[in-house]
């Protein structure tokens, strides 16, 4: 596989942004060690926006010959008040539920979970020189920049927060350098931390990423955030500015169960959630069901996706590209209910191996039902 083919795998859906493609090409060309990482807070159940979007990209990175790592951010979750802010509970959930759920998600998206290294944050944070790296980074970042970066925790600028939360962005940047990560991966909502990492990379004294004497900047790969299924707070959306603002607010959320499908959901739960989903006829600009079709079903094109309909409504129709389906929907040739039903059946089939695993091994879900899920 040549360099351009490897770059195309990194750029493949659901990737929305690579900072920068030129730097990625440079890392391939000089033969730098390619170490990927994606970090997760440990909170509630894993939904498709976490499991499938991250799992899909991990599969792509593996195909491109990049070492993959999932970072279980227990301390970060504690700082951000997840699972009642109980560090021991967070660690138990990380190892007994989250790790297993991500392994299964990676597998259904075509990756090899056995080739993914899972690292608990506390394994490295308890080493003294980690904090040296945090301070080194902090000396190169202004307080106002840190304040603007708290949105990576799902917090609003201006929100009353405890001081520990100001340390969080610097820890997230330190995680990259301390682990020798050359490819930092996350959803688009983590962009601010990754931009800081790129900007400070060549200023660091402790744990810079060095290859043959060259201080390297990490590459940041940001995947699409799946939209939640709920109706936006304002509809219709009139201006482009409103559209961007609402789209950023309406990502899938585990705290809004009907906005999300979870990886262990039963067939009936999936059908029910899709049936209630916001999916206005002919609306292709803001439509969560179409969003899922584009980034889950048509991640690879061409692919065959069949919508089953009674003969009196036109009979079955098979699409091979997202644009074909989108055009039919915009023209009113594809009814929202038919699309919802087809997406539900696709997801039921895709998630079947995960569902079967948790039916045979109920302990992780029993653990989740016993803990206090906050935020």
From Swiss-Prot:
ATP binds at residue 254. Homodimer. One of its GO terms (biological process) is tyrosyl-tRNA aminoacylation. It comes from the Archaea. Transmembrane segments: none annotated. This is Tyrosine--tRNA ligase. Its main location: cytoplasm. The keyword Cytoplasm applies. It catalyses: tRNA(Tyr) + L-tyrosine + ATP = L-tyrosyl-tRNA(Tyr) + AMP + diphosphate + H(+).
């Amino acid at each position: 596989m040549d360099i351009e083919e490897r770059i195309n795998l990194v750029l493949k859906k659901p990737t929305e942004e690579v900072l920068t493609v030129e730097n990625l090409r440079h890392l391939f060309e000089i033969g730098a060690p390619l170490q990927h990482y994606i970090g997760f807070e440990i909170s509630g159940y894993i939904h498709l926006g976490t499991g499938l979007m991250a799992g899909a990209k991990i599969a792509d990175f593996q195909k491109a010959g990049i070492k993959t790592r999932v970072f279980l951010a227990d301390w970060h979750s504690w700082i951000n008040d997840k699972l009642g802010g109980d560090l021991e509970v967070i660690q138990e959930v990380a190892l007994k539920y989250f790790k297993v759920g991500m392994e299964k998600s990676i597998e259904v998206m075509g990756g090899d979970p056995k080739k993914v290294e899972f690292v608990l944050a506390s394994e490295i944070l308890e080493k003294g020189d980690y904090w040296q790296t945090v301070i080194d980074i902090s000396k190169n970042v202004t307080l106002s920049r840190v304040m603007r970066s708290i949105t990576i925790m799902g917090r609003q600028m201006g929100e009353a927060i405890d001081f520990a939360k100001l340390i969080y962005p610097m820890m997230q940047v330190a995680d990259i350098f301390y682990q020798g990560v050359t490819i930092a991966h996350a959803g688009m909502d983590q962009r601010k931390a990754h931009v800081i990492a790129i900007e400070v990379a060549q200023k660091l004294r402790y744990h810079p990423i060095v290859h043959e004497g060259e201080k390297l900047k990490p590459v940041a790969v940001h995947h699409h955030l799946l939209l939640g299924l709920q109706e936006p707070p304002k509809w219709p959306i009139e201006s482009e500015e409103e559209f961007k603002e609402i789209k950023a607010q309406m990502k899938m959320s585990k705290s809004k169960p009907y906005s999300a499908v979870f990886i262990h959901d039963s067939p009936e739960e999936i059908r029910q959630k899709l049936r209630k989903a916001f999916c206005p006829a002919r609306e292709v600009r803001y439509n969560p069901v179409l969003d899922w079709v584009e980034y889950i079903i048509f991640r690879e094109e061409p692919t065959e996706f069949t919508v089953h309909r009674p003969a009196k409504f036109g009979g079955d129709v098979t699409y091979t590209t997202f644009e074909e389906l989108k055009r039919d929907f915009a023209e009113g040739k594809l009814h929202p209910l038919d699309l919802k039903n087809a997406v539900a059946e696709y997801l039921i089939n895709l998630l079947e191996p995960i569902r079967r695993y948790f039916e045979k091994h109920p302990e992780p879900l029993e653990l989740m039902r016993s803990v206090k899920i906050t935020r």
